[in-house]
Amino acid sequence: MSAFGCSSMTFHGHTEQRAFGGCRNTGGALSRFAILAGCWLGLICTKSWGAEVTAAHPSAEHIEFFENKIRPVLTQHCYSCHSAEATKLKGGLRLDSRAGLLKGGDTGPAIVPGQPDASLLIQAVRYKDEDTAMPPKKPLPEALVADLEAWVRMGSPWPETEKTGSPARVETQGFDWAKFRSEHWAFRNVVTSEPPTVKNTSWVSHPIDQFVLARLQSAGLTPAPPAEKRVLIRRAYLDLTGLPPTPEAVTTFLADPSPDSFAKVVDALLASPQYGEHWGRHWLDVARYSDGLGGFLDSEELPEAWRYRDWVVGALNRDLPYDQFVRAQIAGDLLSNDRDLAIATGFFAVGPTYISDGGDPEATAQARAETLADRVDTFSRTFLGLTVACARCHDHKFDPITARDYYALAGIFDNSKVELTSIAPREVVNAFDAAQKAIKDHEKLIKATGTNTAAKSQEAPLKAELERLKKAVPAAYAKAHLLVDRGNKDMPVAIRGDLRKPGEPAPRRFLQIVAGENPPLFRDGSGRRQLADAVTDPANALTVRVIVNRVWQHHFGQALVRTPSNFGMLGEKPTHPELLDWLASTFMENGWSLKKLHRLILLSSTWQMSSQYRAESFAKDGENRLLWRMNPRKLEVESWRDSMLAVTGELDRALGGPPSDRILESSRRTLYGKVSRNGDRFLSDEFLRLFDFPAPRSTSEQRTASTVPRQHLFMMNSGFMAARAQALSARLQRESSDDQTRITRAYQLLYARPPVADETALGLAFLAETTTGTTASRWDSYAQALLSAHEFIQNQ
């Protein structure tokens, strides 16, 4: 297929794009370019959270949202008057079941699933009508109202425990721990299996291939042929660095006949600093990294958050073993006096810290509860693949996680606080503070001279000395947002999640399902250091399975466990459980090295398959769960923008530093754009969110890949795209002397291949047409079409 992916369609006119949104119909040869790569009009569709969800089959994602965001609100603010436990049921309304919400009370159904504006519950919490406003004493925080609106919009999913199929839940006696550990795959020990014997041994170049091929053969499927070398090198560059290869790199690879030619490419990419930037961004998604400004009750800017981002990039580039990578983010400030390790606690410190709305006890408790819920949720889903925050109000409805487990972990974070503090050497801080004190002392002396004539005579030399002191002040020392210990107390279980209602004590410790029936208690400070030890203990199978699954996901577009942050009962089972465990055990044997894991995967025949579509294979495995081909993937917004800057020759490859609010005007990688918690505070937010960047209000395990009209309008009409097209056109004019050579160069830069004859002829015909503006404007339009092509936006 050509770069435009649209050879069978004919259009009878075109739209020439201008730099700032103007359009004019010009007709002619550019008609085949106007829809720009991929037949935009045919691809336009929308993707939503899924208002189609039904009560009978809520997804794991929706249930997590309900348990983390909705049940705590209903429990704390509604159940005292509207549940089975209410002394007197008010308004005939029960809110402790979906059926109760749908039935409603005296005024009708409380919710209309999928329609928040038509739902009485939403109208009440919006506080627009004082006669129906709820809760009666004061409105809910805006963030909680937004959560309720989102929940109704997605169809009001509500988990029904009697339908869970949980094999070991006994309501009256707690959990059958042994049964869970023996029957649920995620809680079993990692077992290293021998790679299975397969028939087509010629395809196998790696143990990974044996596991994959065995599943394919059992289903009557065969693997796709190998990808062409040009496709392979472009895939490797995009997978490992988020940038395309240069034509020179492609030529060198094609000319290298040695059997390890591709291994050399992989090793070079893993050694490049761009590797850490690209994979650091993947990690920042799960770490819900932002530069602050989350809105109501979470409105603080985090001016030094970028230091955590840079720490992640640096740690990945130097291949810090993953167990140490995890330990540093949980307790880096406690592991050594190295302030660099302390920066790693930004994993928690740059998350939301809610403040009290008004300072009353209820608001203070709510803010504290929401902050702790974020810490526990982000920690457990990121490192363990478990939704521990679902046990905030009660024992987990599906997984072997008790409310005591939740508050044991919450107590650890309740004994830790966020500080913006120095990471500079003590002598640097002392010198700066001494200089500032000297300035203040001189300012006081000047002020003390008053109007006395004799004293006034001393003012001039004092002012001169003050100016000298100001010029001599050393640069402000570096600071970072850190998590530090502040106490050593256990928390009680909060009755129904309300911190004002303490229940039984919950000593700080690790999860019972992992640590055993009598887990050791954490008594060392907050307990974070002991928590870090427990999480990275090789006996804990969750941590290692979760990370190898995440790495696999980013290389194939789908994970072996398709719910990467939920390995519990509602999560999906692995498609290749033996392969998952083989990867996990090999990963640990290789010293928890992420770079070795990447290399392992990329050198397999499985990863090197083409993305060739075959109808017979699709009929048997339409979702490609068994991996009969490589999944073609749309580039994430960072890779797409960065790739444009790379091929136009504009990319600034400098590493690290403070973020830019105006990322569309910058030549730096998109990683260095400012990101707000709600995705609506900085200029860079709108662009990023348009192309599926997740709002970092909570951990994000996988991005959506939408195709919506506004994206195509941006490609056609934005000043950013026009500027990139002009830059590419200018580069081609500089580097080549005639149009045919320029067209060839453009295809090599963008797609890592030369154009086929039809593509060259099409380009030459358009460029030669004198009725469509100047030569320069035709080249700009042609370049914009190539940059917007399906082939450029996709990783094959």
Question: Language-model segments: what does each one mean?
Answer:
Residues M1-L30:
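N-terminal secretory signal peptides that target proteins for export/translocation
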Residues R32-K47:
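Bacterial N-terminal signal peptides
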Residues K47-D333, H396, S416-V546, R550-V561, ...:
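Aromatic- and Gly/Pro-enriched helix-to-coil junctions and flexible linker segments
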Residues F65-Y79, L144-W151, R375-A391, L409, ...:
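Sequence/structural segment immediately N-terminal to covalent heme-attachment motifs in c-type
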Residues D106-V112, R697-R703, L767:
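Conserved phosphate-binding loops in nucleotide/dinucleotide-binding enzymes
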Residues I122-R126, P207-L216, A287, A315-N317, ...:
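An acidic, gly/pro-interrupted, aromatic-rich
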Residues I513, N518, D758-T771:
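Helix-loop-helix junctions that connect adjacent transmembrane helices in secondary transporters/permeases
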